[in-house]
Amino acid sequence: MTRLLGGRIEVICGCMFSGKTEELIRRLNHVRLARQRLIAFTPRRDTRYRLGSLVSHNGLSVEARVIDSIRDIPAYLDSDVDVVAVDELHLLDDPPDAAREVCQQLADRGLRVIVAGLDQDFRAQPFPAMAQLMAVAEQVDKLYAICVRCGAYATRSQRLIDGKPAPADAPTIVVGGQELYEARCRACYEPAQ
């Protein structure tokens, strides 16, 4: 067990299908190779795959605790934990500042905190919790997908309803995969009306 001096916060962000969970799992595999103790968390809202696992679109997985709030995390930690991972942060039902506060407290205890999530909603507006966390993180990695329309780098998540862009007044959070979302570049993204 090797705890990082001072701890740190790492954020992995990007649009749908950009490989955020895959990158998180890759980092957690390195943590295991270093014989560090980790604990991973996933939101109860994420019902796309197996509850209790971080699962990437390509099928990689890691066991995870299911939580409703970022504030649930400290109750699961003991003194042996070195690394805390949270996938799909934007799906947690918390005030925007809760993620920043909890992650900073964990990093201040000397833990490495790795968080993955969407940086923007389907309207191309920032998810407030992710934006706040990115501002205080030691490392922010923005990943991109490939635009399904033109093949350029995609940074937007286009939500579709019957093949058309979702209206601006649609709910911000709708859990889904390729049946509801497409990765699109700035030029091909159609703003919600």
UniProtKB/Swiss-Prot annotation:
It holds the Pfam family TK. It comes from Roseiflexus sp. (strain RS-1). Zn(2+) binds at residues 147, 150, 185, 188. It catalyses: thymidine + ATP = dTMP + ADP + H(+). It is found in: Cytoplasm. Keywords: ATP-binding, Cytoplasm, DNA synthesis, Kinase, Metal-binding, Nucleotide-binding, Transferase, Zinc. Gene3D superfamilies: 3.30.60.20, P-loop containing nucleotide triphosphate hydrolases. The active site is at 88 (proton acceptor). Belongs to the thymidine kinase family. Homotetramer. Transmembrane segments: none annotated. GO terms for biological process: DNA biosynthetic process; thymidine metabolic process. InterPro entries: P-loop_NTPase, Thymidine_kinase, Thymidine_kinase_CS. GO terms for molecular function: ATP binding; thymidine kinase activity; zinc ion binding. ATP binds at residues 14-21, 87-90. One of its GO terms (cellular component) is cytosol. Its EC number is 2.7.1.21. This is Thymidine kinase. It is an enzyme of class 2 (transferase).
